[in-house]
């Protein structure tokens, strides 16, 4: 039996300024989840690069839960970013959003790649 994927939603906000503030809050939450994940990775692999993997089933579960939390935080941030890209017409803001996309998506991809590598080596 498979379960339907969790539907990710963000609060509705009116206006660009509240959405920009919300984007910053979502990015802060993403960064906190990234810090938690990095801390958990150091417990499972002291080198934090997949070369010295060791942990028990409980730690493996924690790593998998960290991945879900990071993905959820990234998806919420991404939903808000897409809203702003559609609604905001300020060229300075649009450039800023594109720079944030490049930075945050790279952090997300790098973290997920390392975590998946660890889980495969441990599993």
Which positions does each model-derived feature cover?
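Extended alpha-helical scaffold segments
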Residues: 1-123
């Amino acid at each position: 039996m498979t379960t339907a994927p969790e539907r990710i939603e963000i609060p509705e906000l009116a206006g660009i300024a509240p959405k920009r503030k919300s984007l910053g809050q979502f990015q802060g939450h993403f960064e906190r989840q990234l810090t938690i994940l990095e801390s958990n990775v150091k417990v499972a692999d002291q080198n934090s690069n997949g070369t010295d993997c060791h942990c028990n089933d409980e730690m493996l579960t924690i790593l998998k839960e960290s991945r879900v939390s990071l993905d959820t935080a990234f998806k919420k941030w991404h939903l808000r970013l897409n809203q702003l890209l559609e609604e905001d017409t300020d060229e300075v803001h649009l450039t800023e959003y594109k720079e944030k996309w490049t930075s945050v998506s790279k952090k997300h991809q790098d973290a997920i790649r390392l975590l998946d590598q660890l889980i495969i080596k441990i599993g």
